[in-house]
Structures are given as structure tokens and as C-alpha cells.
């Protein structure tokens, strides 16, 4: 996991090819209750943007950078994608 932007995302998956490649950034959060899961996802997406995790990959030339937030509470999981 390499550092990007102003910190380090939890998980980054990227293709070897840059010009035709893609990057997926995942930020993970633990929620205290099922009711808090959506807010945890929103915090994770805000962190991705605030810390500029995608910028190094865009600068490197990756045409597609997708950003996802995942929140967990016990055995439940919620996923939100950045627009």
C-alpha cells in the first residue's frame, strides 16, 4: 500500500497498464450500530476527497479512478460509491 495524496487509503487496487488502466480506492470504517453505517460511509468518502487519495493516480495518467467507502457493523456491510 503506497501513500497517496495526504495520507494512505486503506486499500488500493490498480492495473499494471497505466494508459488503459484503472484504479479502485477503498476506504473502510467500522460503525457502532447498523443505524450509523451510512454516516460511516459518508465519512469515508469525505476522507478520500479531503486527503486527495486519487490525485497521484490521476497525475500518473490513470484514466479511471473509482472511489468506494465500506462500513462494517458486526456481520453487516454497506458500500457507497463516490459520484
Language-model segments: residues:
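Structural signature of nuclease core domains in nucleic-acid processing machines
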Residues: 1-83
Amino acid at each position: 500500500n503506497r501513500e497517496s495524496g495526504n495520507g494512505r487509503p486503506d486499500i488500493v487496487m490498480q492495473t499494471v497498464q497505466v494508459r488503459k488502466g484503472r484504479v479502485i480506492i477503498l476506504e473502510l470504517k467500522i460503525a457502532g450500530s447498523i443505524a450509523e453505517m451510512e454516516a460511516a460511509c459518508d465519512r469515508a468518502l469525505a476522507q478520500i476527497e479531503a486527503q486527495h487519495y486519487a490525485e497521484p493516480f490521476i497525475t500518473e495518467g490513470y484514466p479511471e479512478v473509482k472511489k468506494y467507502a465500506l462500513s462494517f457493523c458486526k456481520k453487516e456491510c454497506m458500500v457507497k460509491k463516490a459520484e
